[in-house]
Amino acid sequence: MKNIAVIPGSFDPITLGHLDIIKRSAGLFDVVHVSVLNNASKQGFFTIEERIEMISEAVKDIPNVEVEYFQGLLVDYCNKVGAKQIVRGLRAVSDFEYEMQLTSMNKKLDDDLETLYMMTNNQYSFISSSMTKDVAKYGGDVSSIVPPNVELALKQKYAEINRRP
């Protein structure tokens, strides 16, 4: 029986902090599903398809990582792919309260599902997708916080937005 984990997130866009958690999880599990969700409480900057493409490129050299889109309840998705673990990255203590609420609800819905928290390496602890977009929007250098393909995608997206009347 394979040891399967799910790393859910909006990944809008994926950062080196996300990639750190994905790589380390890939060393712990037989299969890691990076599951892209559409967060209704957030306005998406990149489309789901663009996010999946960027993540797939960033993880292409990690053979046991699969990238997929899902909608609906995370517990249902985990059951569909045979995962018994959810991996969540934590940047700081401030992330924990929200994550604990999610974990409690998932546990209420499926008592067999476990959530594992992984601290992001210190060099990535300040990075968020929102902050990354803000820096890129004003032409700041994001090369040290996102994979190269994401840096290019951000530049292209903002160039396109700035060309609009």
UniProtKB/Swiss-Prot annotation:
CDD domains named in the record: PPAT (cd02163)
Annotated keywords: ATP-binding, Coenzyme A biosynthesis, Cytoplasm, Magnesium, Nucleotide-binding, Nucleotidyltransferase, Transferase
Molecular function terms from GO: ATP binding; pantetheine-phosphate adenylyltransferase activity
Binding positions for ATP per the UniProt entry: 10-11, 18, 89-91, 99, 124-130
Subcellular location: Cytoplasm
Binding site for substrate: 10, 42, 74, 88
Cross-referenced PANTHER family: PHOSPHOPANTETHEINE ADENYLYLTRANSFERASE
UniProt name for this protein: Phosphopantetheine adenylyltransferase
Organism: Macrococcus caseolyticus (strain JCSC5402) (Macrococcoides caseolyticum)
Gene: coaD
